[in-house]
From Swiss-Prot:
Family classification: Belongs to the microviridae B protein family.
Principal location class: host cell
One annotated Gene Ontology cellular component of this protein: host cell cytoplasm
Organism: Chlamydia phage 1
InterPro entries xref list: Chlamydia_phage_Vp3 (IPR014131)
Keywords assigned: Host cytoplasm, Viral capsid assembly, Viral release from host cell
Name recorded for this polypeptide: Internal scaffolding protein VP3
């Protein structure tokens, strides 16, 4: 048995042969080169504003500290999905994913339906209703003045 080395005359044939049509657009090669983009940005900083959409906006640099790290964010998403999938099927069937359900819950127009489905704590419902009534009374009294 012979072992292959880097000094062998005989080279192994390539294993991967891509004969499909390429999805890359060759003319974009020079436009999207990182070296070219950095060079253009150094020559003319306003070049970057074309990508941002606002020519008056100044670039901002710095860290954005967050109390959450990636693992915490993943756990929050997992808990949200778990809560969504623990709902009864007759409620879940109206929503294709947890995000759609959450946006529906946050819409004030759906508040009565959320209450009818029993998804809210009855005590919190009463507190919210009394607060809304109080706010409406204040608006009416301020409009009368």
């Amino acid at each position: 048995m012979k072992f292959r080395t880097i000094y062998d005359e005989e080279r192994p044939a390539p294993v991967l042969e891509c004969k499909d049509e390429s999805l890359c657009l060759a003319y974009q090669c020079t436009e999207t080169s990182i070296e070219k983009l950095v060079k253009l940005a150094n020559q003319n900083p306003s070049y970057l504003h074309a990508f941002a959409g606002d020519p008056t906006r100044q670039p901002e640099y710095g860290e954005c500290p967050s109390p959450l790290d990636y693992q915490d964010a993943l756990e929050i998403v997992a808990r949200g999905e778990e809560a969504f999938y623990s709902l009864p099927a007759n409620i879940r069937v109206n929503f294709s994913n947890p995000m759609e359900f959450l946006s529906w819950l946050e819409d004030p127009a759906n508040y009565d339906e959320v209450e009818k489905l029993g998804l809210l704590d009855p005590e919190k419902v009463q507190i919210r209703k009394s607060k809304l009534q109080k706010d409406q009374k204040e608006e009416v009294s301020s409009e009368e003045k």
